[in-house]
Curated annotation (Swiss-Prot):
NCBIfam families: fliQ_rel_III (TIGR01403), PRK15333.1 (NF011861). The keyword Ribonucleoprotein does not apply. Required for surface presentation of invasion plasmid antigens. Could play a role in preserving the translocation competence of the Ipa antigens. Required for invasion and for secretion of the three Ipa proteins. This is Surface presentation of antigens protein SpaQ. The chain crosses the membrane at residues 11-31, 54-74.
Amino acid sequence: MSDIVYMGNKALYLILIFSLWPVGIATVIGLSIGLLQTVTQLQEQTLPFGIKLIGVSISLLLLSGWYGEVLLSFCHEIMFLIKSGV
């Protein structure tokens, strides 16, 4: 039972870590574009969305190798627990 709770806890932790970078990048881009729009009094609504989309896409592209390694390691751990009869 404790192994199942451990795996559930680790899965939630991985979800938190995986979502941290894209959300953080979108937040930083949104704040900086919002500040730039405030200073220049530009009222374009689609500008932050497009730039955030590009930023998050680039971050996911750059981090996809690391995401794959961590997720594969987690899956191996789960398969080992299933094989051992938990």
